[in-house]
């Protein structure tokens, strides 16, 4: 068609010939184009010879009316214009240039002659376009009802459930992140790195929640969009009377329907399981972790086996030694108080002799001296406790400075 249009184009205006006139040199031009050239060369006293725009051959200027009409060329142009406005037959995608003029009744597709004889449709049943049009017209109504009655309400309900579950999950994760932030704001700056690390884990969990729900949500939205497009396509060609156009649109409509029907719906059990996996946690569980084990803190949704496996805190060796000293002192104080006061100034041998000569005190004196010993032991315990506390604070501060 493009090559034919070149031969039907006027060399002057570059448009299809309109009332073509032929010169003596056999070249044809539009009547209006020739009139424009002659009007430009017209003089009141003298008319120069007219030269052909193509071959430059001179022609006697006797006016446009004297030129013959090219009836053959005008008829060809008129037929070309009628053919150009007619709908073009679709061509086969597999065999270039071959028109789709056969309908395969087995695969329900438009095919070309090569497809029917040598392609995948060899041996299938074929029918004329008019017959196929009547069959597919009946099948269209049934397929339209299938698409129209597709479980759109169920998809909308499922989509709302997914969005609601996603919102609840993200809100729960956000609340947990806030609680984690509040907890770590109360700690020393040595815990800042761990706080950021756990918040990063929570952000990763948010991403995991979105990666879990978003694909299903997007897939269902795409299915609804495909349903809408299929209905629009169906509404646009359900009243077509041209068999070729109807069958071609029917083929696209079947593809849309196949995509819609192949979209599975997620089960509510999967949604409930995804939401139940985000269990609540209590930040007070971290109170059991000692400062030297901060790096072993578990994120809220990680395994808490570490906390349950922590051994009970053993008393520091320094504290155990102090208590032993206290017990020895408490045991010796009663004996020292029972000795005569002048015995303390004697030599070791004299003390032995003095011990052999003193008598046991009365029960009242024993009770009085026991009370005195208890007060002395309590004072010593208070002093040692204060000493231990100061030592532990110094140890914690030193460790904190070392970690920071």
Swiss-Prot record:
It is a single-pass membrane protein. The gene is trim13. This is Tripartite motif-containing 13. Residues 186-236 form a coiled coil. Pathway: Protein modification; protein ubiquitination. It is found in: Endoplasmic reticulum membrane. GO terms for molecular function: ligase activity; ubiquitin protein ligase activity; zinc ion binding. GO terms for cellular component: endoplasmic reticulum membrane.
């Amino acid at each position: 068609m493009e090559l034919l249009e070149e031969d039907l184009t006027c060399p002057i205006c570059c448009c299809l010939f309109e009332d073509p006139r032929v010169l003596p040199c056999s070249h044809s031009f539009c009547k209006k184009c020739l009139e424009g050239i002659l009007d430009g060369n017209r003089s009141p006293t003298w008319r120069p010879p007219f030269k052909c725009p193509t071959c430059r051959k001179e022609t006697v200027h006797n006016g446009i009316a004297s030129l013959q009409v090219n009836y053959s060329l005008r008829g060809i142009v008129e037929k070309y214009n009628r053919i150009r406005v007619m709908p073009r037959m679709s061509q086969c995608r597999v065999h270039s240039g071959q028109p789709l003029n056969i309908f395969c009744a087995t695969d329900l597709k438009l095919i070309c002659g090569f497809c029917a004889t040598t392609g995948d449709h060899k041996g299938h049943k074929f029918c004329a376009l008019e017959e196929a049009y009547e069959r597919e017209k009946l099948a269209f109504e049934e397929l339209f009802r299938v698409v129209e009655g597709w479980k759109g309400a169920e998809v909308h309900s499922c989509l709302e459930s997914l969005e609601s579950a996603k919102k609840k999950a993200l809100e729960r994760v956000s609340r947990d992140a806030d609680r984690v932030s509040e907890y770590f704001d109360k700690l020393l700056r040595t815990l800042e790195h761990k706080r950021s690390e756990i918040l990063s884990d929570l952000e990763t969990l948010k991403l995991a929640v979105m990666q879990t729900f978003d694909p299903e949500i997007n897939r269902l939205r795409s299915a609804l969009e495909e349903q809408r497009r299929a209905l629009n396509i169906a509404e646009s060609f359900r009243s077509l009377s041209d068999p070729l156009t109807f069958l071609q649109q029917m083929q696209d409509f079947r593809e849309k329907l196949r995509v819609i029907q192949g979209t599975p719906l997620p089960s509510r059990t999967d949604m409930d399981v995804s939401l139940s996996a985000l269990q609540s946690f209590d930040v007070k569980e971290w109170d059991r972790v000692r400062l030297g084990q901060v790096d072993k803190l578990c994120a809220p949704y990680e395994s808490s086996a570490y906390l349950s496996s922590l051994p009970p805190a053993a008393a520091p060796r320094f504290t155990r030694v102090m208590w032993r000293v206290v017990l020895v002192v408490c045991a010796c104080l009663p004996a020292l108080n029972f000795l005569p006061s002048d015995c303390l100034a004697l030599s070791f041998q004299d003390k032995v002799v003095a011990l052999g000569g003193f008598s046991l005190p009365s029960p009242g004196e024993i009770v009085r001296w026991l009370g005195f010993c208890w007060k002395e032991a309590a004072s010593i315990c208070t002093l040692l406790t204060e000493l231990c506390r100061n030592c532990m604070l110094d140890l914690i501060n030193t460790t904190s400075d070392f970690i920071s």
